[in-house]
């Protein structure tokens, strides 16, 4: 396992997404909620003023993979915000009732019309400012069959030298692709971990 230093977000227009979650009403009884620290807790939570329900908000999980076919990597150019027009790997939010690997395969089919075989864990990226955890797997694309799904402008199999680094949508994708290529060149499969926080002002080395 390899742990990298925390990264800053330096891609123009790359804002936290989704927006911070703000609650006004209880989803159990419809009464107003108030942000406060409940008794016995240490963090502020939205608490219903009527029924007393405490609404816990936890990080969302984004799952993706790096599909490879005969040495080339499958990339998608986003058709939706955030970062419309920029390139990424197939990825999206984990749904209830599915595993991480199932989510990675589903996103590949939805965004790239590609049926992939999901392999080993590649990276885990804590995106603190967006309240998200991004998980990426290695994957193989058995046949060069793919296309642009509803959320993609175009999809392409590219050689490593053709990756449009300046137009990669998200820092987590950039980190993951670079670690993937490093591992491939070294003939290894490692797990990589890092933290991204746009609130940090320093740019770490390494």
Which residue stretches match the model-derived regions?
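Short, positively charged and aromatic/hydrophobic N-terminal segments
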Residues: 10-11, 17-19
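Acidic, metal-coordinating catalytic segment for phosphate/diphosphate chemistry
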Residues: 23-64
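Conserved hydrophobic/aromatic beta-strand scaffold that supports enzyme active sites
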Residues: 25, 45, 66, 75, ...
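Conserved Nudix-box catalytic region and its N-terminal flanking loop in Nudix hydrolases
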Residues: 68-110
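Unchanged
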Residues: 94-179, 183-184, 188-190, 200-206
């Amino acid at each position: 396992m390899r742990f990298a230093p925390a990264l800053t977000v330096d891609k123009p227009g790359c804002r936290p997404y989704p927006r911070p979650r703000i609650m006004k009403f209880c989803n159990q009884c419809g009464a107003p909620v108030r942000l406060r620290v409940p008794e016995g807790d240490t963090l502020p939570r939205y608490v219903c003023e009527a029924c007393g329900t405490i609404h816990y908000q936890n990080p969302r999980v984004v799952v993706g993979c790096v599909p490879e076919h005969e040495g080339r990597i499958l990339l998608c150019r986003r058709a939706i915000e955030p970062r419309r027009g920029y390139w990424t790997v197939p990825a999206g939010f984990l749904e209830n009732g599915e595993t991480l690997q199932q989510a990675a395969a589903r996103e590949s089919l939805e965004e790239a019309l590609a049926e992939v075989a999901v392999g080993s864990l590649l990276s885990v990226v804590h995106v603190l400012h967006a309240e998200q955890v991004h998980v990426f797997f290695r994957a193989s694309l058995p046949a060069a069959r793919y296309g642009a799904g509803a959320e993609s402008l175009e999809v392409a199999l590219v050689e490593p030298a053709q990756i449009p680094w300046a137009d990669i949508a998200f820092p987590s994708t950039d980190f993951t692709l670079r670690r993937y290529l490093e591992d491939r060149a070294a003939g290894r499969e490692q797990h990589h971990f890092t933290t991204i926080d746009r609130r940090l002002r320093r740019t770490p080395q390494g």
